[in-house]
Amino acid sequence: AHGASLTNIEFMQMMPGFIEPKRNLVFNEKTWRYVTFDQPVDIANEKLDDLLEQRSGYGPFTSRLASRAIDLAVDQAGAEGLALHYDFPRENVPEFVQTFATWLQDEHGIAPSDEMRVAMYAHAANGGIKIDRTAYTGVEGLYACGEATGGMHGADRIGGLSSANGIVFGRIAGASAARAALDAPEADAPVDVALPEHGIATAVAERLTRCLKHTMSAYCMINRTDAGLSKALQELESLQDEATTLNKPRANDSEIAALARLQSQIQLAAEMVKAMRKRTESLGSHYRAN
């Protein structure tokens, strides 16, 4: 509505994490080499050890390497997660393994030999608001940096660099904004702006948000297909229609905020899916199964 653009929003960092025996725990990617699967996976036994070793070298999913087969096996296990346990060496244990195993045991009561279930989590965005070398967004007076922006990570963001991104482009954005403010004409007197009055019941917003999460998890994680992405767009359109139908006038502040947040999330999700459909080849974190 204001003139800024998005870039690279089809590229997401997706990483494995625990869902059993405890949810939302980080899975240390360096420990893949010590994993034993407790259920069948569609990987030849003679290739499995090499793929696990390769997969131990980086965190987020990439379609670029053969070890994508490990992530695809996790994704194929679905919402129940892939069952596995650790078989750590008894001698010459690397320090990071000792630290991780101790943390699991002491902080969460999980022994390495316990069965665990791992699923894929959406971790961070590679894309975002498009900026130029001065951090300018294309909207007069508006500069951006950090996780809200895209373009500096590319298709594969196998490591972090979030702090470096924020520091480097934060400095650039701050300096650019300061120069623009010095050159800008004096602002006009503020005018009264009509605030929105329509909102949506909190319970309804929570239900529609759960539906939104389900749609994006089902069709827009690792295994992306044209049919699945088309289905996602249909479901998002239905959610937007339902949010419009169920909103109400003279809402309270919480309900107004809930509607604005929900509609923005649905709109962003739809733009992400369109970008995923448009890119028909696999590239970096974007994997097209067909």
Q: How should each PLM-predicted stretch be described?
A:
Residues 136-158:
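Short FAD-binding loop at a beta-strand-to-alpha-helix junction that anchors the flavin cofactor
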Residues 13-20, 119-125, 186-198, 286-289:
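A glycine-rich phosphate-binding loop feature that marks nucleotide/adenosyl-phosphate handling sites
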Residues 180-255:
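Long, amphipathic alpha-helical stalk/connector segments used for oligomerization, subunit docking
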